[in-house]
């Protein structure tokens, strides 16, 4: 959980005043952090689009999310504030009330220890430096072990719900335009990742900065779509393709557009690298290609999957959800996702 301190003094004062006014009980400060991260246009409240972008989990349908939003919106303003979030979730915390309180204490303790380490490490003896490194490593191991347990619990509960609903819900596709660039409202992070290359370069299966063959195919698809959108298009007689009954007729092409906050570009690139490496190793992933638009921090990601079921299952994996959660912080606006089925024969011909 991120530190709730803000980079902007005015935001700092606003959060402190809000926290004081609400008299938040121990552990409830997480909802200040949730509001801050989900509030993309920095107006201090969540619209339904912002709420959906943050809370959608691939299980609840759009209608269910809409119903939940209005249940939480007790002020009937079509917006949610921290008071409403706290009021709703505090009724359902159960044992997690103690968990959130412990996380709040843990967050403060770690920040305090890190500050002490930063101040004293350089002047410490070799033995003291060794002990510090050892404690940092073991603390990280313990936290990762807890994270793994939580991720297993998440997967189990979500899979159980999907089985009860007899199949995965269709993911929400968001198309939101925000008024202007989002201001930076997060804590300055330690710059521990420093790729020196100005371009994102990953050497791995299925991922190249410039993949001429598949960029050509993608461009052909884009031109075809552009032609179909023209009103004066003259359609030629279709060329029929006979498909055998046991042949997979289509594959899923997914296009994802992401506008990255400039100051978070390096961390986004690292998260993207980990995501692509994990996704490319999946049996149902045929290929992933990436384009970065020049002179702006905008990425186009093209994913080829065997079918829509495989892609929907991929969305529920830990690595995919981790990437989605990190994008809440890294992106100026929610990503735009579009999908289309293309003939599987196109893939076979080019492989």
UniProtKB/Swiss-Prot annotation:
Record-annotated EF-hand domain positions: 26-61, 60-95
Tissue specificity of this protein: Expressed in brain (at protein level).
GO CC terms: cilium; cytoplasm; cytosol; nucleoplasm
InterPro entries per UniProt: ABM_dom, Dimeric_a/b-barrel, EF-hand-dom_pair, EF_Hand_1_Ca_BS, EF_hand_dom, NECAB1/2/3
UniProt KW keywords: Calcium, Coiled coil, Cytoplasm, Metal-binding, Phosphoprotein, Repeat
Location(s) in or outside the cell: Cytoplasm
A Pfam family assignment: ABM
Residue list for modification Phosphoserine: 4, 192, 197
Domain ABM: 252-340
An example Gene Ontology molecular-function term: calcium ion binding
Record: residues binding Ca(2+): 39, 41, 43, 45, 50
Domain of life: Eukaryota
UniProt feature coiled coil, ranges: 135-163, 209-275
Binding partners and assembly: Interacts with STX1. May interact with CPNE6.
Protein name per Swiss-Prot or TrEMBL: N-terminal EF-hand calcium-binding protein 1
Native organism: Homo sapiens (Human)
């Amino acid at each position: 959980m991120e530190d709730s301190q803000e980079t902007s003094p005015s935001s700092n004062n606003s959060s402190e005043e809000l926290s004081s006014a609400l008299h938040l009980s121990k552990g409830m400060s997480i909802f200040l952090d949730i509001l801050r991260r989900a509030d993309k246009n920095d107006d201090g409240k969540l619209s339904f689009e912002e709420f959906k972008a943050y809370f959608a989990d691939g299980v609840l349908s759009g209608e269910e999310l809409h119903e939940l939003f209005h249940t939480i919106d007790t002020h009937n303003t079509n917006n949610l504030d921290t008071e409403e979030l706290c009021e709703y979730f505090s009724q359902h915390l159960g044992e997690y009330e103690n968990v959130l309180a412990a996380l709040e204490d843990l967050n403060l303790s770690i920040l305090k220890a890190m500050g002490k380490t930063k101040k004293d490490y350089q002047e410490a003896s070799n033995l003291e430096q060794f002990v510090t490194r050892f404690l940092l490593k073991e603390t990280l191991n313990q936290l990762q072990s807890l994270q793994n347990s939580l991720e297993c619990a998440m997967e189990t509960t979500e899979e159980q719900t999907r089985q009860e609903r007899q199949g995965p819900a269709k993911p929400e596709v968001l198309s939101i335009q925000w008024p202007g660039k989002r201001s930076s409202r997060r804590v300055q992070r330690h710059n521990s990742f420093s790729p020196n290359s100005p371009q994102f370069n990953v050497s791995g299966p299925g991922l190249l900065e410039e993949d001429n063959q598949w960029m050509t195919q993608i461009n052909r698809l884009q031109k075809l779509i552009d032609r179909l959108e023209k009103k004066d298009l003259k359609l030629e007689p279709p060329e029929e393709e006979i498909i055998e009954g046991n042949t997979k007729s289509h594959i899923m092409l997914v296009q994802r557009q992401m506008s990255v906050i400039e100051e978070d570009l390096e961390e986004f690139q690292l998260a993207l690298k980990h995501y692509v490496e994990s996704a490319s190793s999946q049996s149902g992933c045929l290929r992933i290609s990436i384009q970065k638009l020049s002179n702006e921090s905008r990425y186009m990601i093209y994913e080829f999957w065997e079918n829509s079921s495989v892609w929907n299952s991929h969305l529920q994996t830990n690595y995919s959800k981790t990437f989605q959660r990190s994008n809440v912080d890294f992106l100026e606006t929610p990503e735009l996702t579009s999908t289309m089925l293309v003939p599987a024969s196109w893939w076979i011909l080019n492989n």
